[in-house]
Amino acid sequence: MLNRQAKFERKTSETDILVEVFLDGNGKYQVATGVGFFDHMLCLFAKHGALDLTVKAAGDTHIDDHHTVEDVGITLGQSIKQALGDKQGIVRYGHALVPMDESLILVALDMSGRGHLELDLPLPAAKVGNFDTELVEEFFRALALNCGMTLHVRMLSGRNTHHIIEGAFKALGRALRQAVSKDQRLTGIPSTKGVL
């Protein structure tokens, strides 16, 4: 098996982001974005995705957290895409149904090469601590488009905003872990087109 890891940097006038990902890791993480709740969610994603993740970000959080959260999504998506290489032998599809107390979240994804997000995640509160919850959608969209994954995130039940978001990040990690896993029975690209 090839060493499925990647390092990506993104520097703009608004943010300076470094992401390193190792798809065949064991859930180790080192995350510092300057956005506390977001850091917590990225750590959960790495742990439940069993991927090793480093994220270092500096951004214009004195304005708000939008640029940092979105740009981390962009850079993480590019890192995962690069780490996957030509996608030979991967399972390709992944899904997870994750309970978090009263909330129940479904994530399904396809490493299709076609970035797309379908989000049905009504969040009761506009903020969790200092975190603007509308940024969850911005992160998922940036990740999906830059990774080239079709991503569906759906809340089946839930009342507590923290629980709903946490369930979504855990489910994303578990679904991605499944999708990027190697299937020993497959020798090529998991598509009749021969390319993803």
UniProtKB/Swiss-Prot annotation:
The keyword Metal-binding does not apply. InterPro entries: IGPD_sf, ImidazoleglycerolP_deHydtase, ImidazoleglycerP_deHydtase_CS, Ribosomal_Su5_D2-typ_SF. The keyword Repeat does not apply. GO terms for molecular function: imidazoleglycerol-phosphate dehydratase activity. Pathway: Amino-acid biosynthesis; L-histidine biosynthesis; L-histidine from 5-phospho-alpha-D-ribose 1-diphosphate: step 6/9. Keywords: Amino-acid biosynthesis, Cytoplasm, Histidine biosynthesis, Lyase. It comes from the Bacteria. It is found in: Cytoplasm. It catalyses: D-erythro-1-(imidazol-4-yl)glycerol 3-phosphate = 3-(imidazol-4-yl)-2-oxopropyl phosphate + H2O. It is an enzyme of class 4 (lyase). One of its GO terms (cellular component) is cytoplasm. Its main location: cytoplasm. GO terms for biological process: L-histidine biosynthetic process. SUPFAM superfamilies: Ribosomal protein S5 domain 2-like. Its EC number is 4.2.1.19. It holds the Pfam family IGPD. Belongs to the imidazoleglycerol-phosphate dehydratase family. PANTHER family: IMIDAZOLEGLYCEROL-PHOSPHATE DEHYDRATASE, IMIDAZOLEGLYCEROL-PHOSPHATE DEHYDRATASE HIS7. This is Imidazoleglycerol-phosphate dehydratase.
